[in-house]
């Protein structure tokens, strides 16, 4: 999570509707995150996420189809929308969160660490992390 002193206070962020989280990329049942800190937990501290990430990265160079199946088991967070609990299409749209996610894929490894570090210090970034492949960046 970004600790910039210029960011909105955590209390202010948590008054707004929270993004929906799905148990996997294929799941259609969701629930809203309980707090902004949940993002950090699910991405950086969750044992299931860590296990799936490690399996995915090991398999990417061996069996891309199996790696893709592993990836689809990962959690999915929809930053911009809070869905009604039983759907994942626009007909189940409930509330806007006013959040935005930037997703950069295939970042050259020579600059990825630098980009992660730089984005982590932005007052506008709530979370900065590498994608499941380890070759991308999400802000």
Describe each PLM feature range.
Residues 55, 112-114, 137:
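Generic alpha-helix signal with a bias toward terminal, lower-confidence helices
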Residues 94-95, 101, 111, 125:
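Generic detector of bulky aromatic hydrophobic side chains
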Residues 107-123:
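Short amphipathic alpha-helix segments
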Residues 1-98:
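DNA replication initiation on ssDNA origins
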Residues 102, 120, 124-139:
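Histidine-centered divalent-metal-coordination microenvironment in nucleic-acid enzymes
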């Amino acid at each position: 999570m970004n600790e910039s002193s210029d960011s909105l206070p955590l209390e202010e962020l948590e008054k707004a509707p929270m993004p929906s989280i799905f148990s996997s990329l294929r799941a259609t049942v969701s629930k809203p995150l309980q707090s902004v800190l949940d993002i950090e937990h699910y991405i950086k501290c969750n044992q299931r996420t860590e296990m799936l990430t490690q399996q995915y990265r090991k398999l990417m160079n061996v069996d891309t189809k199996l790696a893709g199946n592993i990836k689809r088991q990962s959690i999915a967070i929809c930053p911009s929308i809070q869905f009604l609990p039983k759907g994942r299409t626009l007909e189940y749209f409930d509330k806007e969160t006013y959040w935005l996610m930037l997703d950069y894929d295939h970042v050259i490894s020579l600059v990825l660490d630098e980009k992660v570090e730089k984005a982590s210090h932005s007052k506008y970034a709530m979370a900065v992390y590498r994608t499941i492949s380890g070759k991308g960046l999400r802000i």
